[in-house]
Amino acid sequence: TEAIGEVGGFSLTVRDDLRLYLVQVAEKGLAWLNLIADGTAGHGSMRNPDNAVTALAGAVARIGAYDWPHRIHPAQQAFLDAVEDALGIEINADSVEESLARLGTVARMVGATMSNTANPTMLKAGYKVNVIPGQAVAGLDGRFIPGYEEEFFDTITELLGDKVRYEIANRHIAVETEFSGALVDAMQACLQAEDAQAKAVPFLMSGGTDAKGWSTLGVRCFG
C-alpha cells in the first residue's frame, strides 16, 4: 500500500531544459532529549566543585561543537548524483551547502541530511542569581539518519560525560522506502505530461512528516 504525504512536489530549475521535482522517500528520526545535570545546591558566594550548571554547560558546549561524520543515505546520494549530473559539478561532502548555494534554501536542507544532528535549544536552571541550583536541564533536538539511531545515542552519551544524563522527551523512528514502483512511474509520467523538462528525484527530509505514522501501518509514503 502506498500514500502521498505532506512534503515534496516542489521543483528546482537547474538548467533551462531541466527541472528537478523532489519526492521525499526518507526522513530522519527524531530524538528530543532532556539533558540533566545534578549537583550540590548552595550559596553563590561559596566555592562549589559540584556545580550542576557548570557540568551542563560543558556537555552542551561539547555537543554544539561536535562535527558529526557524514552518513550518506541512498536517497541522499541519488539526489546528489542528479544535481551533479545536471549542473556538471562535483559536490564536496564537507562543503555541500556551498557547492549547492545556487539552489537557494534547498542547500541548507541538503546540508542537514548529510549527517546526524543535535542542537541544544533550551536551558533551565536556578531561580535566583545567588543560589547555586541542585539541578540544571537543557533541551536537545536530535535527528538521526535512517540506520544510524544507535550511533546517534552512543555519541550523545559519550559527549555528555559522567556528570550529565539524558531522558527521552519524544522519540520517533526514521523512515525510508525505495524510489521505485508503479506510483513513482506514474509521478514521472504525470510530471512530464505537464512539464517536458521535468525529472522526479528522491530526497531525504531533515524534519518529520506524517510518513512516520503511515510507515507503522505498513504504508510506503512519498512526499
What do these predicted regions represent?
Residues 1-9:
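A glycine-rich helix N-cap at a beta->alpha junction
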Residues 8-223:
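Metal-dependent amide/peptide-bond hydrolase catalytic core
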